[in-house]
Amino acid sequence: MRSKPSGRKRVVVIVHEVRGVTENLVRLASFLTSEGFAVVLPSLYSDGFVGSDEHASYRKFYSEVGIERALMAIGDIIEEHVGAKISLLGFSVGATVAWLLSGNGKIDSAIGFYGSRIRNHLDIQPSADVDLYFCREKGFDVEETIGTLNAKRNVSAALIPGEHGFYSTSPFASPQIERANRLILTSLKR
């Protein structure tokens, strides 16, 4: 899905999680377009895969796409919009991709939700403004990661209620997604 940028309109590139371009992400793209943003919502899967099972989706993502290909694909989209204000909006692995690209000097901002793998890339120093939102996770100390991130220039990290993957698994009108959409709009309108 792509809406055309006009003038200096901010371009929002939504980077999906391992489940692919879910119905909720399509609805988010429509919502952001109605708010005046140009939106790009690419599928990183060559077959347009949308998965309902997290574990199967995870295996498919890492066997067919992987972080490096995702970085190249999103990097190509960034290059297509040079001169525009560009924001990356990522979920899970998409948040990690947004984080990894936040220091490239080519984007204005990045927003990430439940990007748990960001903890493996704390050496990144963003040149863009970055807002990161984490949910509690069993596999690592989220609060320690948030503290490390908040010590960096241009980064705001926070713990929000919810579970990893809520944007794909909750109803679009749920309080969690409505809260996330408010956070997204606040970041994009800054």
Where are these regions (language model features)?
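Serine-hydrolase catalytic machinery in alpha/beta-hydrolase-like enzymes
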Residues: M1-V82
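A conserved short beta-strand
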Residues: K106-R117
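Acidic beta-to-alpha connecting loop that harbors the catalytic carboxylate
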Residues: R136-G139, G162-E163
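Gly/Ala-rich beta-loop-alpha elbow adjacent to hydrolase catalytic centers
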Residues: L89-G94, A98
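C-terminal catalytic histidine-bearing segment of alpha/beta-hydrolase fold enzymes
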Residues: V155-R190
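Short beta-to-alpha linker loops that shape the active-site pocket of alpha/beta-hydrolase fold enzymes
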Residues: S43-D47, S116, E163
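Short beta-strand/loop motif that positions the catalytic acidic residue
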Residues: P126, D131-F134
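Short alpha-helix in the alpha/beta-hydrolase fold that links the catalytic acid
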Residues: L28, F140-L149
